[in-house]
């Protein structure tokens, strides 16, 4: 099993943060490695929405990493499941209101099967690198609030 999480405090209202995160089209603004993203099916920004995404893989290859929003609780939680690609983690953004803004926790969980289980250390490292990008979200939203 591989698990990674990271959290930041963003000086913005929980609904502002939620509205930005629920829109999959915003991912390239704060997550590196996303080559393309589009809404594949379902209503945008809601439970059931499926986003077609390609990301940078090893050796410069482009890898499918489509995902579906599996839970959407406005101002509180967004969960998703990766549905394409070799590794298919589930994850979520968990928001809580604090006096100084919104605390956001980004968590990823992956249960490797078969031979992928032998690569657990590499998968764990890659997942940690993904969740730490939450620091970039904080910067992006700070700039947006100043504009």
What are these regions, as identified by a protein language model?
Residues 1-40, 46, 147:
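Hydrophobic ligand-binding cavity/cleft-lining segments
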Residues 2-7, 15, 50, 62-64, ...:
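Intrinsic-disorder/low-complexity, polar/charged segments enriched in Ser/Thr/Lys/Arg/Asp/Glu/Gln
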Residues 81-132, 139:
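Beta-strand/loop substructures that line and gate deep hydrophobic ligand-binding cavities in soluble
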Residues 38-84, 132-147:
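Glycine-rich portal/gate segments that line the openings of hydrophobic small-molecule binding cavities
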Residues 15-18, 131, 135:
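Amphipathic alpha-helical segments that line or abut small-molecule/effector binding pockets
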Residues 10, 55, 108-110:
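Hydrophobic beta-strand positions in extracellular immunoglobulin-like domains
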Residues 6-8, 39, 65-71, 82, ...:
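Hydrophobic/aromatic beta-strand elements that line small-molecule binding cavities or substrate pockets
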């Amino acid at each position: 099993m591989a698990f990674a999480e990271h959290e930041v405090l963003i000086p913005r209202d929980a609904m502002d943060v939620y509205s930005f995160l629920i829109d999959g089209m915003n991912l390239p603004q704060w997550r590196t490695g996303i080559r393309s993203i589009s809404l594949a099916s379902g209503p945008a920004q809601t439970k059931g929405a499926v986003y077609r995404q390609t990301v940078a893989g090893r050796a410069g290859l482009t890898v499918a990493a489509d995902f579906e929003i599996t839970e959407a609780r406005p101002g509180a939680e967004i969960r998703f499941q990766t549905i394409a690609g070799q590794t298919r983690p589930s994850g979520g953004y968990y928001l809580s209101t604090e006096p100084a803004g919104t605390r956001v926790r980004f968590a990823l969980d992956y249960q490797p099967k078969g031979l992928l289980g032998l690569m657990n250390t590499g998968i764990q490292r890659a997942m940690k690198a993904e969740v730490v990008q939450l620091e970039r979200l904080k910067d992006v939203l700070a700039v947006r609030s100043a504009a």
